[in-house]
UniProtKB/Swiss-Prot annotation:
<dbReference type="GO" id="GO:0030145">
    <property type="term" value="F:manganese ion binding"/>
</dbReference>
<keyword id="KW-0533">Nickel</keyword>
<protein>
    <recommendedName>
        <fullName>5'/3'-nucleotidase SurE</fullName>
        <ecNumber>3.1.3.5</ecNumber>
        <ecNumber>3.1.3.6</ecNumber>
        <ecNumber>3.6.1.11</ecNumber>
    </recommendedName>
</protein>
<feature type="binding site">
    <location>
        <position position="39"/>
    </location>
    <ligand>
        <name>a divalent metal cation</name>
    </ligand>
</feature>
<dbReference type="GO" id="GO:0008253">
    <property type="term" value="F:5'-nucleotidase activity"/>
</dbReference>
<dbReference type="GO" id="GO:0005737">
    <property type="term" value="C:cytoplasm"/>
</dbReference>
<feature type="binding site">
    <location>
        <position position="92"/>
    </location>
    <ligand>
        <name>a divalent metal cation</name>
    </ligand>
</feature>
<keyword id="KW-0862">Zinc</keyword>
<dbReference type="GO" id="GO:0050484">
    <property type="term" value="F:GMP 5'-nucleotidase activity"/>
</dbReference>
<comment type="subunit">
    <text>Monomer and homooligomer in solution. The oligomeric complex consists of at least four subunits.</text>
</comment>
<dbReference type="InterPro" id="IPR002828">
    <property type="entry name" value="SurE-like_Pase/nucleotidase"/>
</dbReference>
<feature type="binding site">
    <location>
        <position position="9"/>
    </location>
    <ligand>
        <name>a divalent metal cation</name>
    </ligand>
</feature>
<keyword id="KW-0547">Nucleotide-binding</keyword>
<comment type="similarity">
    <text>Belongs to the SurE nucleotidase family.</text>
</comment>
<feature type="binding site">
    <location>
        <position position="8"/>
    </location>
    <ligand>
        <name>a divalent metal cation</name>
    </ligand>
</feature>
<keyword id="KW-0464">Manganese</keyword>
<dbReference type="Pfam" id="PF01975">
    <property type="entry name" value="SurE"/>
</dbReference>
Length: 253
């Protein structure tokens, strides 16, 4: 198995390094990751400037000022030959639950892999301690995919409780919950009196009941949420069409 491994925490982050070490025990792994933390970069792609790469002695590649999407795009189309069999993103330092997937660079890297035609996993740890647990879970899933490919055409967003492996209760297939909208902005002043703004923390849990990714992780289970790239709200198409007809938009200007 050939794995393209990326993240949004940066090439030196403990999550990606722990996962790379574990994956290399049974797979051919190429790390292509940002040279710094790009959390919250979502699906952004660098278009107005060039991208420079640096290759370390162990073969890992850092993309200077690159986003997670840049890294996967370059990895698939230029840096990994032969091309990968699968794209893996993580292990993220902190969860990507509910609405987090909108902003997450970790999920975006996996989404880019799927968009380019490859199976893709996004892996996040609900904390900053037991990366070895998340690595073991990821390796188990990848070994299973080797034996029997999962042909859903979906991204698997995997969130792992920050617990020792022997305390993980199992795996649940979940849906995304939701958070309350985030509304905190933290102002500061620089030494010259100019105002600076920091984006505040995410909103608290809103829809976090049974069946959600939040609930699974809170109860000690690994959460796997299938995600897809197509953002079309198919069930709303007829509603929008009927509304346009009723208000006359498109028939008179």
């Amino acid at each position: 198995m050939r794995i393209l491994l990326s993240n949004d925490d940066g090439v030196h982050a403990p999550g990606i390094q722990t996962l790379a070490k574990a994956l290399r025990e049974f797979a051919d792994v190429q790390v292509v990751a940002p040279d710094r933390n790009r959390s919250g970069a979502s699906n952004s792609l660098t278009l107005e400037s060039s991208l420079r790469t640096f290759t370390f002695e162990n073969g890992d590649i850092a993309v200077q000022m690159g986003t997670p999407t840049d890294c996967v795009y370059l990895g698939v189309n230029a840096l990994m030959r032969p091309r990968p069999d699968i794209v893996v993103s993580g292990i993220n330092a902190g969860p990507n639950l509910g609405d987090d997937v909108i902003y997450s660079g970790t999920v975006a890297a996996a989404m880019e892999g799927r968009h380019l035609g490859f199976p893709a996993l996004a892996v996040s740890l609900d904390g900053h301690k037991h990366y070895d647990t998340a690595a073991a879970v990821t390796c188990s899933i990848l070994r299973a995919l080797c034996k029997e490919p999962l042909r859903t055409g979906r991204i698997l967003n995997i969130n792992v409780p920050d617990l020792p492996l022997d305390q993980i209760k199992g795996i649940r297939v979940t849906r995304c919950g939701t958070r309350h909208p985030a509304d905190q902005v933290i102002p500061q002043q620089d030494p010259r009196g100019n105002t600076l703004y920091w984006i505040g923390p995410p909103g608290g849990k809103c829809d976090a009941g049974p069946g959600t990714d939040f609930a699974a992780v809170d109860e000690g289970y690994v959460s796997i949420t299938p995600l897809h790239v197509d953002l079309t709200a198919h069930s709303a198409q007829d509603v929008v069409s009927d509304w346009l007809n009723s208000v006359g938009v498109g028939t008179q200007w």
